[in-house]
Structure formats: structure tokens, C-alpha cells
């Protein structure tokens, strides 16, 4: 089930022994620097704690929390395993795992817990000055390129971003033999990118490689952010510098 912060059940889902399918929220935004206001509580067959899929959904959907209740051989509740996203921290930890406990013995004021978490996220957002530049994460996939070439191209991309008035706050790279046709990067690295974008309070993700329309659309939906590639960034710079009507038409 999905439960809101008032304790009301908003969605009921039925899965199988391996997985459940969460609702498709489409482009319903959670708000920058904000969680979605829903926690997912579901059961696992046997003594399995939170899985990689659970943590991926927690990150991609920006849920308040992900809770998995194990079951005994008799079909009774076992332990409740819970995790929540962490704001940016010195340890670099993305997820906080709460101490497993029988469901009836969970000792957590969830409203207070999530209120403190969102206050911490709000404080981080307030460190941005009014009128400050857009903040971005740069992403590069090797796909057979040499490390030296990647480093040089990323340095060049940073300079292009600065020329466009964008503040680069992080860089994510992935080494893989070929790019993913749907997302450019792998699902594991996408999960990491979602969390880092959330923690860094960014507005924009810039890919070093050219994205297909399908890749750009899929990434924007998953990240809930504006996603562009190197070519689009260069066009943005031209557009900013175009003063005449003819110049603007040429950029378009």
C-alpha cells in the first residue's frame, strides 16, 4: 500500500512473489528538494530485507520511505525493514536504513521524522542565493572512449556550462562498452544520479554525448528535471548571445 502523511491509504497494489508494480505518476512533480509525501509499505515472501528494486523505487519516485515486512513460514509478519533518502551529508550516504523491528514494535514518530527531514532539505535549498545561476550535474558515458579523451571533453563541457551561466556542482561518469538505447546510462547509475541530483538541489542535467529524443524524454521523466546534451548547451549559449532577430532565427 501507499500511505500519505496523514496515515490514509491512497493506493492498494497486488504483486507476486517477486515484485509489485507501483502507480505511474507520469509528470506529477514532487517539487524541487521535496519528497513525494507517500510511503510504500509492502510484504516480502520469506526473510528477505529491502531489495535493490525497493531502493531504486525509493530514489526514482522520491518516496518518504520504503518499508518491507518479511513473513514467516506460517504466513505471519516477521520484521519490518525501512529506509529513507538522506539529504546531502559529509559521509556521502544516500539512504538511511532504520533498525529492523517487528511491525508492532516500531518506535518511530513518522510525522516528526519526515518533518525534520524536509526542514533539513529546505535549509539546504535556502543556501542558494536569489537569482543564482542554474545548478547542473554533468554526465558522461565512456562507450569505448579513452579516459584521457573523456577527461578533456568533460573539462570542455564545464567551460561551456560556465559560458551558459550554469554552475556545475557534480560530475557523474560511467564506463560501459556501449550506451543504453533507452537511457544512455545503466539503471544502477541512473539511481545514483537521481539521488545526487536530489541531494545537490540541481535544476539541470547535462550529458556529454548527444541524446536521442527518446533518451532525452525518458531521462527527463525519470529524473523529473530538465535534461540536455552538449549540442543543446551550445545552442543555448548562441541563443543567449543572439541580439538581433536574424540571429535568434538562425539559432532556432
Regions flagged by a language model, labelled:
Residues 233-252:
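Extended, highly charged alpha-helical segments
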